Amino acid sequence: MHLKVLALVLGVTGVLACSAQTPEPSEPPADPSSDFEELPELKASEILKPEVFQGPHHTVRESVPTSSGMNQFVIDSDFGVFDADGNEMLLRRVKEVYAIAQLKDVSRTDQFKQSLLTAAQGPYNAAKNLVKDPVTAVSNVPKGVMKFMGRAGQSIKNIGKKDESQSEDENKVEKIIGYTKTKRKIAISMGIDPYSTNAVLQKQLDEIAWASWAGGFTFSAATLPIGGAAGAALTVTQASDSLDKMLHEKPPADLRAINRSSLRSIGVGATDTERFLNNTAFSPTSQTAFVLNLKSLEGVANRAAFVHAAAKESSNESDALFCVQTSALMGQLHSGDHPLARIAMIENLPVCIAKDGTVIVTLQWDYAAWTPAAADFTGQLQKLAAQGGEGKPLLIVISGQMSPRLQQELQSRGFTVRDRANSGPLR
């Protein structure tokens, strides 16, 4: 992502209404008579790896607007049309298309069909409506039972009609816990997010999980690779082994408690902790990933400021992903050649100060251009670096690619630039 995305994510309006993405270097250069670059419309076939652009079950539409600060993709698939805000979301959605395909293949097997019959005749059939919620379309925000199970696991104790006994309520809780654990196991074994907001995927996961939990269906991840060229390219995720383990073993309520403890341990106040934990822009997965990333910044002061901004300004899944991926880039720098000392804030934007004094901006930014707001923000960074009378080194690190013009402008102002720190689906 780039600075305009940050304006949306962290509310840095005015300072960061900025930049976007430019065509690949092969595109015609900006008009030399213009002081700044225009926001372009990219071509998917030119910027994406071939296996991401097209596969047996999907094609990314050619037009890729950059108006919101992220590459805006539309995916036509055998299972419907999916939107993807940004490079990272594109990778996730394409991978989910192939997970849906594999799950549908499983649902056609005789073993699966027999398991459904067994489930229908078994003691858990009455609980089916408690743990499944039919879905007909992709939504950016989980709804109904899916949202309940995904974000408010602590409310599980309240399930049940008012005239039912406590023992009956506890029995229903046990049923839901067993089902959701099975569903998490299936999703994670396939390398996909069990709390994905892709409702088509959730419906397929529901079916397989129900047959497995209530009907005795034997599910093996070994039989469900995300196949083909696309699968080979997409099986690498940002999730660490510790995140995968936590998602597999812990229900949302436990993750919430762990995240609360971790946030308090790194200096986040009680108010900001609860505000962050209650922000539904963050799924259990993105919430936990963000906290783990911040926790990995051992010894870095003022991490609480990033949490404050994320909790206050994030309003959707793309915002949460931005925070997760940006904090992951911070972790890469901290464990690599730029150990960090503290996080400073320019309004709501976190800026890293390294132990050697280097001022570092590290962002998930798809493809960045030189715009008026980028110029304004550059000036803000230069002022920060000049504080104390001694100019500090300046470094900008982004996940995607910078335009040649942007690199030139930054370098001429004394910045060191580093792009493609996590190029994702880009060629």
What are these regions (language model features)?
Residues 399-427:
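Domain-level recognition of nuclease-like catalytic cores that cleave nucleotide substrates
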Residues 7-15:
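Bacterial N-terminal signal peptides
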Residues 146-169, 234-276:
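Membrane-engaging insertion elements
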Residues 157-206, 210-223:
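Extended amphipathic alpha-helical segments with heptad-repeat/coiled-coil character used for oligomerization
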Residues 328-388, 394-396:
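Conserved catalytic cores of phosphodiester-cleaving nucleases, focusing on short active-site segments
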Residues 262-349:
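Acidic-basic catalytic patches of nuclease active cores, encompassing PD-(D/E)XK
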Residues 37-162:
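Cationic, glycine-rich low-complexity segments
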